């Protein structure tokens, strides 16, 4: 038998099981959840929304969406233009949507679900799939 095995066996027998202690975390690391920390049924927000944080900067996502009047104008432009000859205002709007991580499969979540925005959604989908990487 090798000397290292003998030393290891003696250390295990003399000092208890060191390997078993290493497998279990220390008791001071374990914490219990309080009764008021249980699962809640309320809606949770993953963003911090306090005034100090929002004083100067808006999120890219919020900045990408124009007001109702501008949105109506863009929807009208989408009705009158073809997908391969979009105006610069529509291209810029689509680029802003892309920067805000909006894509054709989740655009309906951002309020573009009405019939008046149907053509705008179609133009955005075509631009996103075919023209986004070219420009």
Curated annotation (Swiss-Prot):
Location in the cell: Secreted; Host nucleus; Host cytoplasm
Residue spans of biased composition, Polar residues class: 34-43
Gene disruption phenotype: Leads to gain of virulence on potato lines carrying defense protein R10.
Family: Belongs to the RxLR effector family.
UniProt keyword Secreted present: yes
Gene label: Avr10
Residue interval(s) of motif RxLR-dEER: 44-63
Role: Secreted effector that acts as an elicitor of hypersensitive response (HR) specifically on plants carrying defense protein R10. Enhances P.infestans colonization of Nicotiana benthamiana leaves.
GO cellular component: extracellular region; host cell cytoplasm; host cell nucleus
Induction cue: Expression is induced during host plant infection.
Keyword Iron: no
Swiss-Prot/TrEMBL keywords: Host cytoplasm, Host nucleus, Secreted, Signal, Virulence
Start and end residues of each stretch annotated as Disordered: 34-64
Name under which the protein is recorded: RxLR effector protein Avr10
Compositional bias per record (Basic and acidic residues), positions renumbered to this chain: 46-55
Domain observations: The RxLR-dEER motif acts to carry the protein into the host cell cytoplasm through binding to cell surface phosphatidylinositol-3-phosphate.
N-terminal signal peptide: 1-19
Top-level division of the source organism's lineage: Eukaryota
């Amino acid at each position: 038998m090798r000397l290292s095995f003998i030393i290891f066996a003696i250390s295990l027998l003399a000092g208890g099981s060191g390997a078993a202690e290493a497998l279990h975390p220390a008791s001071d690391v374990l914490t219990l959840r309080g009764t008021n920390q249980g699962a809640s049924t309320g809606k949770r927000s993953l963003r911090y929304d306090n005034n100090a944080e929002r004083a100067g900067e808006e999120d890219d996502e919020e900045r990408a969406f124009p007001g109702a009047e501008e949105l109506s104008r863009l929807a009208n432009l989408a009705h009158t233009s073809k997908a391969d000859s979009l105006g610069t205002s529509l291209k810029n709007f689509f680029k802003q949507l892309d920067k805000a991580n909006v894509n054709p499969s989740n655009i309906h979540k951002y309020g573009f679900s009405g019939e008046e925005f149907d053509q705008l959604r179609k133009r955005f989908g075509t631009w996103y799939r075919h023209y986004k990487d070219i420009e």
